[in-house]
């Protein structure tokens, strides 16, 4: 096989592997951002965090109705505690994603 073709195939394989690893890392981060409370599942994202912030900004911290991932209503009775739980989970997972992403970039070397 021609040397340049061999190098090109090797490069393509390394790049494909790297892209697959990044894709898996993103999926893992999304899966880890799931919070279960009161028998309901919430995917923690910036929309949910901002909704809590909005409620807290208008001083509605005692209770509010939220829709879970399955669009079922659930009454959250302590918005501050819920907000602390979701932001903590989100930040831990984002930090883990950051560390693992940087490790992948470091390990990939010269692609």
Regions found by a protein language model. Give the residues of each.
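A preference for well-ordered globular domain cores
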Residues: 1-111
């Amino acid at each position: 096989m021609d040397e340049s073709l061999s190098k090109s195939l090797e490069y393509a394989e390394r790049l494909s592997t790297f892209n697959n690893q990044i894709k898996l890392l993103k999926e893992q981060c999304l899966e880890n951002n799931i919070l279960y409370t009161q028998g309901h599942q919430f995917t923690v994202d910036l929309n949910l965090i901002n909704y809590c912030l909005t409620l807290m900004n208008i001083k509605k911290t005692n209770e509010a109705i939220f829709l879970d991932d399955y669009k079922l209503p659930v009454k959250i009775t302590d918005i501050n505690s819920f907000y602390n739980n979701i932001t903590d989970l989100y930040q831990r997972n984002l930090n883990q994603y950051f560390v693992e992403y940087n490790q992948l970039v470091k390990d990939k070397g010269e692609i």
